[in-house]
Amino acid sequence: MAKETAVEVKIEDRTLKLTNLEKVLYPEAGFTKGQVIDYYTRIAPAILPHTRDHPLTLKRYPNGVDAEFFYEKNCPKHRPPWVKTATVWSGGNNRDMYYCLCQDLPTLVWLAQIATLEFHTSLSYASNLPEPRTMVFDLDPGPPATIVECCKIGLMLRDVFAEHGLDCCAKTSGSKGLRLYVPLNTKVTYEETKVVSKGLAQLFEEQHPDLVVHKQLKELRTGRVLIDWSQNDQYKTTVNVYSLRARARPTVSTPVSWDEVEKCLKAKDPSLLVFNSDQVLARVAKHGDLFEPVIKKKQKLPKSLVAATGGAAALEKMANRRHSTSGRLRKPPAK
């Protein structure tokens, strides 16, 4: 058995032990753990504003992308004492969960050191979990559809948002699809974003039945784009922008411009929206953070969009149901 190699490094005011830097985590690309750590170190100025203060689910691949992996919601007990956590009540587990918070470069490097290839974050701040910062649409193609078809649907969604005075940003999933983020950063609830996103997905399916589905049933998805609205949920996390993906090669969930989305659709070339770690670092050096509006732009969810998607009736029904069951709802224990 090869002897484990280790090196001690000083990052800001923290000391970290890095091990097995030569271990290959992406066999097809020969991409090592050391290169994973290097990528996250160099992308830190872009990724940290998007991870900071958001509960984080780790997707870890200790033996590489071709081997077993696991999701980790509870921050590892062996974490350094300076890694911050967020306490989140889990109704399903009937207990508190302690999510990692990726607040700074030392934490980011430590997470990469324990083979966290993918970073999945909540849409909320840990300090205000009931309120999402953004509304998300995950466009997932069912083969033989590709990201090209996702681009078509994405542009149509963008135009709908524009009609209601909303801007939105696009990023690749780093896998097969495209994701649209509507910045909010104002007072809003998941009930509101969920009914609007679901209503819009249903409308698109009604108007474009050959192109779109809104349910995740596999038999419905062949050749169509799933508009997955279900990520708009207080108890879910979704892959963070600039996160590596555990594919054959080290692709990245990458912000893209609408010009690039249009170009991909026109050329019908999915490869135009596939970016590896080196390409993403070069893009950020040239263009900055194309996803910055997601965390900085403030937009209210317009009543016109709520009405257009049937959200008003759905919200009223939810409110009535809440009122009728308010005395029976189980609450987490008092702190």
Report each predicted region and the residues it spans.
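Long, highly charged amphipathic alpha-helices
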Residues: R42, K152-D159, V195-L203
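Signature for HUH/AEP ssDNA processing cores
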Residues: Y98-S173, L184-T186, Y190-E192
